[in-house]
């Protein structure tokens, strides 16, 4: 079919009566894209040329004849050159998928025409099935789905693009959903074109662990999270639930303090982890149980350390799950009790515990004095 379409396009040009050497040789693209329509498309100015080129790219069309009978013959070349430059520079799909656009002037049906050829560096499927995100919120959702699937990349057309710190976005999502993001990948980011409110966003993820292994780890970690939900009694108070989840997490193993690239899996399935893994998993387990727990980043005795701040009965407290490595039990601590810990106080709630009741005001003695006694 591709070869037939190419021959039809060449035939349109040859029937004009010009010599064969006056026209571009039309060869089907090896990537499998469509070769186009032999019917010439009439263009009369720059805007129409630009629209025709963008339509070719959007449809993954390789060859198309443009009829330029209504244009000044002396302006055709300059106008088409400008339209090609603009298309490649500003159109998201062209910037993403086009390797080269070439053309040859001639005639079609005894009228001036241009045979345009486009060479692509993406497959027809990649072009025609490009996902779309209306804004950065939808883009973030697509990125999260890709992370959940341990995919190696995600690409989409973003209609309203805003510059974003994607490394931080991925780290935040991984911290909130450690049962899904087993390993935080390194990220390579590209936008097509490089600048603009509407562009194609491509993120490539690199993992040290194979996708098959990551999916297996996901399944095992999610089973542990399911067990944690069952461990919490529905009629318990929030204080009891915090304590139950603390015990569930810290008493699973005789833990060994080490850092792992598959933090949640190593901690929950092999008893190997650091303070960050403890705090992240505890916060996520609390969230699945309807409890509020933040992950705090700071230092403990001068070393990098992570712990949690929980909200219990309307009051905030510090809880350090990794203290179990030193034999610690569940304790709700106020700020003044965090000896050896340092954190950015402006970033987290103040942990003062319940307010002390105000002392009762002294009542004035209204009993009569001895002088007034009768």
Predicted regions and their residues:
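Sec-dependent signal peptide recognition
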Residues: 2-10
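C-terminal motif of bacterial Sec signal peptides marking the signal peptidase cleavage site
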Residues: 13-17
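N-terminal accessory/pre-domain segments preceding catalytic cores
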Residues: 19-234, 344-374
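Mature secreted bioactive peptide module from preproproteins
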Residues: 168, 172, 200-202, 224, ...
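Secondary-structure boundary elements
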Residues: 209-268
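Periplasmic OmpA-like peptidoglycan-binding domain that tethers envelope proteins to the cell wall
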Residues: 266-276
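Hydrophobic/aromatic-rich core segments of domains that either
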Residues: 277-342
């Amino acid at each position: 079919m591709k070869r037939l379409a190419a021959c039809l396009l060449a035939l349109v040009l040859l029937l004009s009566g010009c010599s064969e050497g006056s026209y571009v040789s039309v060869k089907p693209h090896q990537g499998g894209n469509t070769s186009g329509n032999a019917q010439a498309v009439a263009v009369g100015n720059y805007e129409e040329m630009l629209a025709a080129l963008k339509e070719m790219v959007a449809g993954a069309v390789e060859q198309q004849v443009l009829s330029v009978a209504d244009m000044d013959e002396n302006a055709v070349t300059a106008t088409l050159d400008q339209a090609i430059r603009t298309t490649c520079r500003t159109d998201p799909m062209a910037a993403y998928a086009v390797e080269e656009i070439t053309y040859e002037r001639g005639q079609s049906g005894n009228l001036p025409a241009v045979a345009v050829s486009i060479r692509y560096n993406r497959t027809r499927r990649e072009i025609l099935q490009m996902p779309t995100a209306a804004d950065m919120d939808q883009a973030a959702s697509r990125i999260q789905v890709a992370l959940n699937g341990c995919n190696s990349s995600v690409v989409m057309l973003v209609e309203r693009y805003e510059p974003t710190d994607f490394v931080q976005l991925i780290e935040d999502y991984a911290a909130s959903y450690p049962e899904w993001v087993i390993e935080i990948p390194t990220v390579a980011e590209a936008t097509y074109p490089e600048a603009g409110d509407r562009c194609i966003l491509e993120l490539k993820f690199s993992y040290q662990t194979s996708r098959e292994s990551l999916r297996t780890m996901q399944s095992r970690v999610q089973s542990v999270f399911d067990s944690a939900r069952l461990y919490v009694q529905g009629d318990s108070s929030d204080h009891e639930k915090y304590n139950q989840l603390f015990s569930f997490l810290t008493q699973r193993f005789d833990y060994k303090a080490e850092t792992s690239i598959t933090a949640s899996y190593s901690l929950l399935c092999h008893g190997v982890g650091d303070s960050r893994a403890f705090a992240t998993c505890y916060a996520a387990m609390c969230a699945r149980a309807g409890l509020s727990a933040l992950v705090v980043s700071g230092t403990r005795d001068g070393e990098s350390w992570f712990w949690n701040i929980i909200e219990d009965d309307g009051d905030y407290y510090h809880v350090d799950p990794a203290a179990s490595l030193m034999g610690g039990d569940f304790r709700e601590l106020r700020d003044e009790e965090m000896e050896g810990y340092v954190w950015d106080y402006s970033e987290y709630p103040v942990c003062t515990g319940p307010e002390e009741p105000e002392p009762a005001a002294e009542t004035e003695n209204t009993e009569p004095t001895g002088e007034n006694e009768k």
